């Protein structure tokens, strides 16, 4: 069944019909979902979801946009929640320079990225990395940590070149691929998907964002992942069923140690 490794069902976009959508997942071929924390102090929604739905798991961490409001208490809370049975990763963490142009902001993000990578290492959990307009700095920090007995991880919503992808693949990491792969102008990502072994790819939505064609611009959900599987299958010259089976196995191997 489909394994969605990165979703945000605690987002307000689902406030009107959250239970209805999540209750339809099994019939839609979706077997597992990881709901990923993002905002500092916004962990409650993920906690509620992993308690309410047996097939929903959690990742706990803070998105780089909130690095400036993180405190030691935030880091302590991430560590505490990482001990929960259904918390399977630290994320989403990383660097985002798109809106944050100042060097001081970059240093702050890097400090909080490293602090959360330390938690991932010490708690023996995989990481989920968000990286936007920060290719070199993200790669440098990940390389540094991958020498320190990490438990692997996913480069979420991968958007860089095939050369950068090759560096992550050499480290044994996974690339998260979602709706962007179906976009006509996604030439760079299609090149990455062509060179990346299927054994190092996982499917993700980043819902409610990043809906694939033919639903681009609408609210996304895990039920759209067959479109992504089909696009990846066409690139690889295999069936969508094989894509779904292998990416599910990949996700379980990384996140469940299965």
Ranges and model annotations:
Residues 1-258:
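Mid-domain alpha/beta scaffold segments of enzyme catalytic cores
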């Amino acid at each position: 069944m489909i394994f969605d490794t990165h979703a945000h069902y605690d987002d307000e976009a689902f406030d009107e019909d959250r239970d209805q959508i999540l209750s339809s997942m099994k019939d839609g071929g979706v077997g597992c979902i990881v709901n990923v924390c993002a905002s500092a102090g916004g962990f409650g929604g993920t906690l509620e979801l992993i308690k309410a739905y047996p097939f929903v798991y959690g990742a706990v961490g803070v998105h780089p946009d909130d690095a400036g409001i993180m405190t030691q208490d935030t880091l302590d809370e991430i560590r505490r929640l990482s001990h929960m049975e259904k918390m399977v990763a630290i994320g989403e963490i990383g660097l985002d320079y798109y809106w944050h142009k100042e060097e001081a902001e970059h240093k702050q993000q890097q400090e909080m990225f490293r602090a959360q990578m330390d938690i991932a290492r010490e708690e023996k959990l995989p990481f989920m990395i968000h990286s936007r307009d920060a290719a070199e700095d993200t790669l440098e920090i990940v390389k540094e940590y991958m020498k320190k007995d990490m438990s692997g991880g996913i480069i979420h919503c991968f958007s860089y070149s095939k050369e950068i992808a090759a560096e992550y693949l050499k480290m044994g990491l996974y690339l998260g691929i979602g709706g962007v792969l179906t976009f006509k102008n996604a030439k760079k990502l299609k090149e990455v998907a062509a060179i990346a072994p299927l054994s190092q790819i996982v499917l993700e939505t980043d819902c409610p964002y990043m809906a694939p064609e033919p639903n681009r611009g609408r609210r996304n959900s895990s039920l759209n992942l067959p479109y992504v599987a089909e696009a990846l299958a066409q690139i690889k010259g295999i069936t969508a069923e094989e894509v779904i089976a292998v990416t599910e196995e990949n996700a379980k191997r990384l996140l469940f140690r299965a």
